[in-house]
Amino acid sequence: MKQTRTAARQSRHQRIRRKVKGTSDRPRLAVFRSHQHIYAQVIDDTRHHTLVAASSLEPELRQKLGKGSTCAASIAVGRLIAERAKAAGIERVVFDRGGNIYHGRVKALADAAREGGLDF
């Protein structure tokens, strides 16, 4: 029987998570994309601790962007997560695309985070 899109994404994400681990030296930049918003977290998997987070739900971004489901919103979240990570002393991360295809909003967030100074 054919998998649904959500089930296929979840199985891809489980496969990725077996390989991608965030450490205190190089934490994991996890991206979650919903229909209306995009979320990014920098996570230390050894301590099970979220170090930095940003999303398109944040008030300053919502006022500027309006909709959180656009590539412009993803770029803004990518810049914000890079800025917050740099402030927390994080330079290098491991990218976790969350089972999503590296295209569109996920790619826009990753490119903006790279431009903001994160190395991955």
From Swiss-Prot:
Q: Where is the composition biased (Basic residues)?
A: 10-21
**Disulfide bond residue pairs:** none
Q: Does the keyword tRNA-binding apply?
A: no
Mention any one GO cellular component term assigned to this protein in its UniProt record. cytosolic large ribosomal subunit
Q: Which SUPFAM superfamilies match?
A: Translational machinery components (SSF53137)
Q: Tell whether Ribonucleoprotein is among the UniProt keywords.
A: yes
A GO term (biological process) for this protein? translation
Region entry Disordered, spans: 1-25
Q: Would you say which domain of life the source belongs to? A: Bacteria
Q: Which UniProt keywords apply?
A: Ribonucleoprotein, Ribosomal protein, RNA-binding, rRNA-binding
GO MF entry, a single one: 5S rRNA binding
Q: What does this protein do?
A: This is one of the proteins that bind and probably mediate the attachment of the 5S RNA into the large ribosomal subunit, where it forms part of the central protuberance.
Q: Which NCBIfam families match?
A: L18_bact
Query: How does it associate, per the subunit comment?
Result: Part of the 50S ribosomal subunit; part of the 5S rRNA/L5/L18/L25 subcomplex. Contacts the 5S and 23S rRNAs.
Recorded family membership? Belongs to the universal ribosomal protein uL18 family.
HAMAP family xrefs: Ribosomal_uL18_B
User: How is this protein named in the record?
Assistant: Large ribosomal subunit protein uL18
Q: Which organism is it from?
A: Thermosynechococcus vestitus (strain NIES-2133 / IAM M-273 / BP-1)
